[in-house]
Amino acid sequence: VNLINDFKGLNLISFELTKPQLNVIQTLTQSRIFLHGPAGVGKTTAAVHRMQYLINRGVPAESILVLVPQRSLARGFAESIRVPDFKPGGEPSILTIGGLAQRMIALFWPLAARNSGFLDPRRPPQFLTLETAQYYLAGLVSPLIQNGYFENITVDQNRLYSQILDNLNKSAVVGFPPEEISARLIQAWAGKPTQSIIYDQAQECALLFRTFCLENNLLDFSLQLSLFREHLWPSLLCRKYLQKNYQNLIYDNVEEDYPVAHDIIKEWLPEFRSSLIIFDTDAGFRSFLGADPVSARTIEQSCDLRVEFQDSFVKTPGLQNLE
């Protein structure tokens, strides 16, 4: 089916879409769809055109929230709103949950900082990148290493700093306090019990860094996400703001996101006028970054329509027959 023939007036390039894709694109604007299927069957393509379809049906572009697990996965959506004939007016917000958290913290900082342990909540926050977080962490941990910390392991110091931050990030995306880092690592360790001291030291360094951040209004990824989940998301003021500004959701590659993100969306989903959740049945490879396909699949229960795409655009018939 040719897009131009079926969607006259839409600002989209000519593209051959299948009937299942068109059905998803043209579904009523007030619907909750869970779209799943293997890679290469056109799920993201349908989602991008669904976004454009909503805009051209009169849905305000700024009321659309597009969520992806990593910014690199948002390329198709970002490119579609950069074309010269994109409908003038507002633009959809294309974010990760982490990006949304940072935006809300910046907007509601007095509310977020209150009762959150910051030494001076009147000062504005400073958001850290991975590089700046490692820089501050190195200043705290280097003296400890010189005093004998981590002496039983051989690892590049930058790699060690990265691992300590990763431990904090894992605690935030899964939803457990950083004070449990050591116990969880020891529980998963199958080697010599004497090595457990390394995990105690790693937790001590992580907590030292967290204290330093709270004293200086520095927010790394883990603190941003925890602050949003524990203090802003439960706030009626923040929830009302989000519900007022975003009435339509497109959430792509949900299987690559982490449990805390899924929990937030499951709570938020009933408030959206329309939502399209996209699940790749062949993915979920970023488990080392916190991806949880099992958690992602639970969102399906909150959707009205379940749609499966099966026909691949990238596999040859011969390869499909082998499978």
Feature names for model-found ranges:
Residues 3-26, 30-35, 46, 146-250, ...:
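Accessory N-terminal region flanking or inserted into the helicase ATPase core
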Residues 28, 50-54, 77, 268:
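Hydrophobic residues on the short alpha-helix immediately C-terminal to a glycine-rich phosphate/catalytic loop
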Residues 37-39:
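The conserved Walker
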Residues 42-43:
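Conserved glycine(s) of the Walker
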Residues 53-62:
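Post-Walker A helix-loop "phosphate-sensing" segment adjacent to the P-loop in P-loop NTPases
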Residues 61-172:
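Conserved P-loop NTPase-based nucleic-acid remodeling module centered on helicase motor cores
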Residues 254-258, 283:
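Catalytic acidic motif of RecA-like/P-loop NTPases
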Residues 263-323:
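Conserved RecA-like helicase ATPase core segment
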